[in-house]
């Protein structure tokens, strides 16, 4: 299944592809998505979040596009580096092979060598992208950009060749297009969509399915016109108009019969497991019913970030909070704030007026750091529910060192290499990587040993969890005892090394003050909300609605008064 955009980028190719993949997965088929990017970067790790949104870290440590997060959340399936390819990876692989002499003296060209490498990668994914490394029934290919872009032309050519080689019943192309609806005209116009699809057909690709993005449901008249000019029957044209939530898209596709059309096109009926489909639909149905149900409460959570002007920079945090609200029967409004504008305690108190809890997320560089520290101090001293993530974890340590231990110059060597009290310093294996930036951090899934009877254990219901990391700095080991004796409890650690990974204050000191060196937002799923976020939202609900403590759904996530005290 190949999904290619036309007219414009940003239409939701990942949402379409992952939603359709979910329907086939629900039927018992093994699906393997892949995103193919046209940029020359090896991965997304060094991209500016203002330009490209958040970096989504996979289990194996690859730093990828935020669309991989969409695939993982909708499919509820962990992906790996084989599910993400850039032009930089393709060219790098070819040049390495050329230097090794793998091409036997031939002149290396775009065709057949570059396109051949793309096809090889896709065939390998087809053979190993299923459960436990087995074959996949369907590979979903999302081509970044739009038809006609110079950067993705070799991908489209490779996919055209692959379709020819594998046969018409092995490949299905989807053109995702856009239907204009100018306010001055008051009607939908299909000309841009027609031209965009024509541009794709000029590349030698005949789409079998067309998905029409639009503000409102696409009229049958418009779909008939598009079908006539693109040789696609009406029953294979899908109106992908705006909906209240992206999680409604799979059900909309099912109602339109799109899954049945794909099974017919690719002759996959004999691989359907009806029993698994019923079970999967019941699970998603429960989630969908909660999604549309009226919420009993409403709270506001402040996101104290450095890239607050672009919500895509924190896309997974946005989704993790949404998941928690659904399962806690609460509407959660996010208030995005740029900490680089906060210069005093008064500034922080003013912007946090009416906020029921805060998240201090990750980031790099010194801009906005002092504002983050002020936010942590405000949360700690006013008992405002607090969740720190990555850099937010480190800022919680520095704030505690400055204001509880009394070391006013406590800092991180990232921001002040000459500080006399380096409470945060580089991980030992990072110090030898001077001048190398891309792909060198502590990346991917790592084990976290959770302290018994701690707040973290109460949330996770486990003494060993696996979370995803993306950092270069850690709590300086020789300060750990001083911090612990003063009341900052490290309840999550690396099982073998003195790397602190979760911190918290006792329930007697704070209802919810917890921070993680890892990125918990990356593992939140629609039907399995992330525990640390659940603890934060539950505490925010109790702060605003004390009577909600009698709600068992909320109370089970609260910081038990005996938990961290007993552990200490």
Where are these regions (language model features)?
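Cysteine-nucleophile active-site neighborhood
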Residues: 14, 18-22, 351-447, 452-455, ...
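A generic structural signal for well-ordered coil/turn residues at beta-strand boundaries
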Residues: 206, 233, 297, 354, ...
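Active-site proximal loops enriched in glycine and acidic residues that flank catalytic Cys/His/Asp
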Residues: 5, 35, 177, 214, ...
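Flexible phosphate-sensing "switch/lid" loops adjacent to ATP/NTP-binding sites
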Residues: 1-333, 340-357, 364-365, 372-378, ...
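C-terminal and late-domain segments of enzyme folds
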Residues: 443-447, 451-568
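Short beta-alpha connecting loops at secondary-structure transitions
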Residues: 51-60, 243-247, 360, 381-387, ...
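Acidic/polar loop patches that form or flank catalytic/metal-binding clefts of enzymes
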Residues: 209, 235, 271-275, 387-388, ...
């Amino acid at each position: 299944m190949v999904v290619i955009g036309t007219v414009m980028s940003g239409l939701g190719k990942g949402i379409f592809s992952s939603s359709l993949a979910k329907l086939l997965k629900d039927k018992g088929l093994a699906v393997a998505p892949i995103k193919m990017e046209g940029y020359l970067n090896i991965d997304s790790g060094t991209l500016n979040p203002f330009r490209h949104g958040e970096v989504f870290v996979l289990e194996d440590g690859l730093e990828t596009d935020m669309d991989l997060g969409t695939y993982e959340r909708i499919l509820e399936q962990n992906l790996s580096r084989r599910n993400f390819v850039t032009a930089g990876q393709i060219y790098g692989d070819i040049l390495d092979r050329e230097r090794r002499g793998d091409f036997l003296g031939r002149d290396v060209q775009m065709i057949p060598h570059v396109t051949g490498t793309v096809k090889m990668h896709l065939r390998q994914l087809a053979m190993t992208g299923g459960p436990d490394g087995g074959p996949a029934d369907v590979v979903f290919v999302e081509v970044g950009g739009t038809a006609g872009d110079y950067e993705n032309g070799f991908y489209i050519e490779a996919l055209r060749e692959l379709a020819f080689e594998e046969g018409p019943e092995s490949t299905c192309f989807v053109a995702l297009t856009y239907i204009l609806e100018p306010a001055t005209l008051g009607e939908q116009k299909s000309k841009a969509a027609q031209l965009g699809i024509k541009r794709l057909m000029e590349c030698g690709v005949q789409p079998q399915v067309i998905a029409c993005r639009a503000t409102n449901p696409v009229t049958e008249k418009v779909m008939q016109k598009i079908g006539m000019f693109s040789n696609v029957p009406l029953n294979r044209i899908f109106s992908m108009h705006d909906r209240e939530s992206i999680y409604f898209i799979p059900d909309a596709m099912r109602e339109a019969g799109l899954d049945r059309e794909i099974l017919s096109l690719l002759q996959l009926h004999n691989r359907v497991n009806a029993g698994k489909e019923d079970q999967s639909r019941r699970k998603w149905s429960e989630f969908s019913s909660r999604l549309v149900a009226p919420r009993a409460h409403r709270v506001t959570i402040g996101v104290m970030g450095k890239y607050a002007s672009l919500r895509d920079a924190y896309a997974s945090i946005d989704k993790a909070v949404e998941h928690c609200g659904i399962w806690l029967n609460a509407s959660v409004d996010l208030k995005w704030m740029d900490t680089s504008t906060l210069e005093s305690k008064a500034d922080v108190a003013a912007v946090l007026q009416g906020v029921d809890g805060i998240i201090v997320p990750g980031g790099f560089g010194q801009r906005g750091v002092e504002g983050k520290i002020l936010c942590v101090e405000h949360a700690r001293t006013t008992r405002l529910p607090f969740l720190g993530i990555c850099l937010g974890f480190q800022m919680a340590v520095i704030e505690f060192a400055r204001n509880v231990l009394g070391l006013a110059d406590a800092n991180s060597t990232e921001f002040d290499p000459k500080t006399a009290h380096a409470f945060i310093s580089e991980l030992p294996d990072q110090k030898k990587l001077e001048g190398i930036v891309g792909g060198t951090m502590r990346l991917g899934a790592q084990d976290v040993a959770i302290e018994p009877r701690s707040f973290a254990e109460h949330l996770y219901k486990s003494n060993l969890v696996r979370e995803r990391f993306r950092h270069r700095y850690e709590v300086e080991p020789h300060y750990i005892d001083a911090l612990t004796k003063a009341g900052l409890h490290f309840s999550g650690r690396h099982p073998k090394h003195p790397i602190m990974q979760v911190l918290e204050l006792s329930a007697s000191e704070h209802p919810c003050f917890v921070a993680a060196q890892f990125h918990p937002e990356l593992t939140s799923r629609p039907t399995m909300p992330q525990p640390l976020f659940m603890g934060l939202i539950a505490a925010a609900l109790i702060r605003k609605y004390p009577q909600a403590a009698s709600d068992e759904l909320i109370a089970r996530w609260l910081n038990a008064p005996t938990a961290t005290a007993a552990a200490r």
